Structures are given as structure tokens and as C-alpha cells.
């Protein structure tokens, strides 16, 4: 991280200088400073930073404004909140920042010490280094998304899900990316909003991704009947009455048993027409597809859906998993979600696992499976296949 670029945002000069000194002693050479949110936004607009330390309480455009700007800018570097506010405020701010899809590493309370900064930098160094340029892409319009669909620019990416105890890959989640004419990788947060505005667009996009993923999956693993493949399905897609029949037909045409397919129902799947959505989910279930409730804990009606529909799987949202070691509320949500699912006979998958310590916490809580950068980032199937054939080395465990 010697050549990394870090921005320190704080209205107190002594804090900025203290942080800069600590970072310099840790080998960081490229350090920028801003004394308020406005200066920070100007720097962020013209520089690429690997990490940003940001205060909350500043007189000219506070830290919340900076976080909002980072979210709109699709910033993928590390974000560290620094403040003298009470722990509950810091924890809530972290959760808010994750709604912007920001990579919150932690909260640092003032006064700042070298030991605290060293711990933060050590954490950052352990994490995969995302490609900021790849995700710094504005939101596409419906017309632009239609162009990419017509030009066959969609690519199916996959992220493995591992059994937390054996470290064997038990399934894959199919994700979608766009690779444009200039080989620029465009992430879903830049085009899903446009797709969700049109029932036709989101259906077309979903079907294209499913077809591409099934083709790759069937070719790469023709005899792996125990390996599951999961798809994200939104409410607008489920409102199409013909979708279950289409899915059954396309899966069968690839020679894949429906029991290998998991339909991950996102929170948006709960909103448009609850009765229609429930009926469609039951149709999928009767066709022998497995059902998963995605991003559990983030929606107002998640528990009601869990009661109403015979789900096979519950996925704990990454916002709770990420800080379950530092946020008592997140830890409680994770533990109680697992306990509830177990009582109902439902498998539990944790999203967003990035460290061994978080993995250990989940194991002790009884979580079945997990996915995240600790194991593998999403990628084309030919890049993921080797991990499936070679289990991740398991640590010695006493539990």
C-alpha cells in the first residue's frame, strides 16, 4: 500500500496532521487533506483515492454530504469514519453508508492513536483491491441499456457459495455485468435502476442472464448434480405470468434438474403485487425449484414472507455480516436470523464475508454457507471453475 493514495477529511488541522503522520509512518506516501466536505468533493472529483478517512461534524458540508457524494460517484475504495460522536451514532452512520454501497472499513473514535490507524491500514491491506475505474460509471438510461442488450454486451458472472465447515463449493450465484464496446466493465448499480423502470427491460435482461449462465454452467459441470445455481429474480419479472413456465422450459432444455436451481427473491420482489408474487413463488416451488429469500433483514415484510412461503434458503444481507464483530446490533440480527432459520428447517447463507474472524463468528453462530471476497470475487465461470474443483484450505477447528 506504499503507493496508495489516501484522503483525510477533517475540519481540525491537528487531526489531519496526526492522521497524516501516522499514515506516513506506516509507509503511505501519497496523502491528501481537506478541511471540509466541499474541498473533499473537489479532490474526489479529480483524483482516485484508495481510502478516505472522513469526519462527520464539519461546518461546511459535513461528512454525511461526503458519504452521499461517494455513493453517487460509485466510489469503491475503503471508507473510514472518524468522529467523537457516541458509538450508536457511528454504527448507524456505517449502516447508512452501506446503503450507498460504500466499503466501510470501520469507525475511528477521537482522539486518534497510531495503534488505531495501524489496525485500520492492516485491515485494508488484507482486503482485495477493487478496480475503482471499472465501477466509476454513470447510471445508464433505458435507451442505452436497450442498446447493450441488442448488442449482446451482457455477461454472466459467478460467485461461489461455500460450505463454511468443509470449505467445498456447494453452489454458484449468477450475476450480471455489461462489457461495452471499449471493454469497460459496467456493474449492476449502473444499469439495474434503468431496467427496473420497465417491465419489458428487466424481464429481457433477466432472461438473457439466465440463458447465458445456464449455457456456461451446463457446459462446465455436466455431471455435478449436487452443485446449485442461483438467480436473482425481481418482482417485475415475477409479475409476468409466463415466467415460471419459461424458466422450467429453459432449465430443462439445458439438461439441468430444477432441484439444482435456486430462485433468489429480492426485496423488490415483495413490493409490487404481493398476492401475484406469492402465487408465482408457489408455482416455482411446485416445479421443484428451490426458493431463497435474499438480503434478509433489510425489508419490512421479510419475516412475513418467511412465514407465508416455503423457502429453502435464507440469505443474510452483507450489511449485517460486514460489521457483526464491531456492532452489537448487527451481531444480534445475524445470530437471531440463523437461530430462527434453523428452527424452521431453512438453510442459511451469509453474504459479504471478507475476513477469517467474521467467518469464525458465523460458524459459531451455526451458519451453513457463505460467499464473499474472502473466498472469491465474482468472475466469468472459467475463472471460478478451478476453485470449485479444488476446495479452499480449511483451518484447524476445535468446535
Regions found by a protein language model. Name each.
Residues 13-32:
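Two-component/phosphorelay signaling modules centered on CheY-like receiver
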Residues 2, 85, 107-118, 235-237, ...:
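EAL-family c-di-GMP phosphodiesterase catalytic domain
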Residues 47-53, 79-80, 311:
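Active-site beta3 strand of CheY-like receiver
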Amino acid at each position: 500500500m506504499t503507493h496508495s493514495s489516501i484522503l483525510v477529511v477533517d475540519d481540525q488541522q491537528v487531526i489531519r496532521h496526526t492522521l497524516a503522520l501516522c499514515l506516513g509512518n506506516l509507509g503511505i506516501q501519497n496523502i491528501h487533506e481537506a478541511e471540509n466536505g466541499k474541498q473533499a468533493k473537489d479532490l474526489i472529483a479529480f483524483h482516485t483515492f484508495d481510502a478516505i478517512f472522513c469526519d462527520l461534524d464539519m461546518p461546511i458540508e459535513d461528512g454525511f454530504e461526503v458519504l452521499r457524494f461517494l455513493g453517487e460517484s460509485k466510489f469503491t475504495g475503503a471508507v473510514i469514519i472518524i468522529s467523537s460522536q457516541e458509538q450508536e451514532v457511528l454504527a448507524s452512520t456505517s449502516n447508512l453508508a452501506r446503503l450507498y454501497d460504500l466499503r466501510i472499513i470501520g469507525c475511528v473514535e477521537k482522539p486518534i492513536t497510531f495503534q488505531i490507524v495501524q489496525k485500520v491500514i492492516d485491515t485494508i491491506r488484507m482486503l482485495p483491491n477493487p478496480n475503482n475505474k471499472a465501477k466509476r460509471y454513470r447510471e445508464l438510461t433505458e435507451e442505452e441499456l436497450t442498446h447493450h442488450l441488442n448488442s449482446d454486451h451482457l455477461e454472466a458472472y459467478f460467485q461461489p457459495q461455500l460450505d463454511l465447515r468443509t470449505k467445498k463449493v456447494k453452489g454458484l450465484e449468477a450475476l450480471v455485468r455489461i462489457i461495452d464496446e471499449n471493454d469497460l466493465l459496467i456493474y449492476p448499480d449502473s444499469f439495474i435502476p434503468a431496467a427496473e423502470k420497465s417491465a419489458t427491460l428487466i424481464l429481457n435482461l433477466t432472461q438473457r442472464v439466465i440463458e447465458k449462465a445456464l449455457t456456461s454452467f451446463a457446459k462446465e459441470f455436466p455431471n455435478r448434480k449436487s452443485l446449485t445455481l442461483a438467480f436473482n429474480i425481481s418482482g417485475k419479472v415475477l409479475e409476468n405470468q409466463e415466467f415460471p413456465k419459461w424458466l422450467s422450459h429453459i432449465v430443462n432444455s439445458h439438461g439441468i434438474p430444477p432441484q439444482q436451481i435456486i430462485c433468489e427473491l429480492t426485496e423488490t420482489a415483495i413490493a409490487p403485487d404481493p398476492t401475484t408474487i406469492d402465487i408465482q413463488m408457489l408455482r416455482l416451488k411446485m416445479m421443484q425449484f428451490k426458493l431463497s429469500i435474499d438480503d434478509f433483514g433489510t425489508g419490512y415484510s421479510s419475516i412475513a414472507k418467511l412465514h407465508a412461503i416455503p423457502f429453502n434458503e435464507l440469505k443474510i444481507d452483507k450489511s449485517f455480516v460486514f460489521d457483526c464483530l464491531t456492532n452489537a446490533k448487527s451481531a444480534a440480527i445475524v445470530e437471531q436470523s440463523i437461530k430462527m432459520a434453523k428452527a424452521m428447517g431453512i438453510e442459511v447463507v451469509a453474504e459479504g464475508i471478507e475476513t477469517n474472524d467474521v467467518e469464525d463468528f458465523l460458524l459459531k453462530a451455526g451458519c451453513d454457507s457463505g460467499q464473499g471476497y474472502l473466498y472469491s470475487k465474482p468472475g466469468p465461470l472459467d475463472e471460478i471453475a478451478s476453485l470449485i474443483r479444488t476446495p479452499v484450505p480449511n483451518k484447524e477447528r476445535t468446535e
